[in-house]
Amino acid sequence: GKSTLVNLIPRFYDVASGCIEIDDLPIESYTLQSLRSNISLVTQEVTLFNDTIENNIIYGGHTSDEIQVAIRDSHIDEFIDDLPKGLQTRVGDQGILLSGGQRQRIAIARAMLKDAPILILDEATSSLDSESEKLIQKAFDRLMENRTTFVIAHRLSTIENADRILVLSDGEIVEEGTHDELMSQEGDYALLHKMQFND
């Protein structure tokens, strides 16, 4: 349901019916390269190469100043100083030598460097402990500034400040609005929020 919906945006799947538009143009009118170059994707499962932290952050062509800003804003600087070789520390296959929170921060730094106008966060905090989630939420807040962001989250703290929240159930949109609007409707969103925050 939810992941399938956002996977339609970068055209991992084609729309069977209806139309998805970006800037009033159907997404099919863009080349895949053009479309995907304008989308950053951060998922629960981060793909890392058996290489250094630095090489896992960059995919080429970035200045050291840009890299340093991404490192600071994604809170990577809070753990790289403790590693034996800092940015040059190797992460192992799929980042096995790093915690889940550290891997997520590398994915966030990548998205910051890409600086795409569309951001998709697909359950990006679901497997993290609450301390890592707090750090990553700060990084997400920075990353989401001035861009269209699609967030799939069961942890509602991730989306409380969203301009528009859609609640899906059985593949259908059942509620839509801001956090305050949805709380006042006392529907599925409000119930889930009350369960998570005991309010």
Which role fits each region the language model picked out?
Residues 1:
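Conserved glycine(s) of the Walker
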Residues 4-12, 36-45, 51-58, 63, ...:
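ABC-family ATPase nucleotide-binding domain "signature/switch" substructure
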Residues 19-21, 25, 172:
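ATP-binding/catalytic-site motifs of ATP-hydrolyzing domains
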Residues 77-84:
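Conserved H-loop
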Residues 197-199:
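ABC-family P-loop ATPase nucleotide-binding domain
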